[in-house]
Amino acid sequence: MTSSDLLPGLCPTGSLRVVINLGNPVLAQGTPEAPTGVTVDSARELAERLGVELELTTVTAARHAYAALVEGHVDVGFLAIEPAREEGVRFTTPYVGIEGVFATGDTDLTVADVDREGIEIAVRSGSAYDLYLTRTIEHATILRGDEAEDVYEGGADVLAGVRQPVTVYAQQNGLTVLEPAFQAIRQAIAVPRDRPESQVAALTAVVEELKGSSFVAASLERAGQVATIPGS
């Protein structure tokens, strides 16, 4: 894939503007001033292929990354594929797969028991698992906040989140992570919805190349993170 296949319309300012969500520790680490991780590595690789400067904007939650894309403040972002987001962005094929899990202090609760009357589930507002549970939960109540852990500590029955940070929190607080995972979260590159499908196709080709060349696997390993790589 050459830069001429990607550049038209992708970088209207002459630089590649990318939003990085530091709220997902599997995909991004570090600080706003010095972010690291597979999303940052991928953004740098894309800018290098295009031969343009990279401008990174960091946020603390997926909903803020989504807003930056929809409002046209950035050209590229890294988000989980969810139907609710497709009205505002277009997605490539997924480059990484992670999982959404429940944790609870109720040792009698199972994954199948979570969706019942009287159960309150704590989520981070606007996250992939919030969107997924919003369209699938029929009986339980979803409680939203900036941090799911804070909502859980406010009295919710179940904490929902990405497996890795939820597991750490569960270990620190004597909770049980319920198996199996309730969601397979497919992470992809996203662009604003008004970008042409040809642009998405070109980015998808890059994603597939980065997966096939072990670029993504090597980046995850450097960051000390474990995730599945779809199609590999």
Can you say where each PLM-predicted feature lies in the sequence?
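A ligand-binding cleft/hinge motif common to bilobed small-molecule-binding domains
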Residues: 63, 79-88, 132-135, 149-183
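Short helix-initiation/N-cap motifs at beta->coil->alpha
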Residues: 55-67, 107-109, 128, 141-153, ...
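Flexible hinge/capping segments at coil-to-helix
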Residues: 92-95, 104-121, 198-201
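Short loop->beta-strand "edge-of-pocket" segments that line small-molecule binding or catalytic clefts
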Residues: 15-22, 26-28, 36, 112-129, ...
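Periplasmic-binding protein-like
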Residues: 22, 96-104, 167-210, 226-232
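Alpha-to-beta junction loops
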Residues: 52-53, 70-79, 118-120, 138, ...
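Extracytoplasmic small-molecule ligand-binding "clamshell" domains
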Residues: 1-80, 85, 202, 213, ...
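Ligand-binding clefts/hinges and TM-proximal coupling segments of bilobed small-molecule sensing domains
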Residues: 1-8, 12, 131-146, 208-232
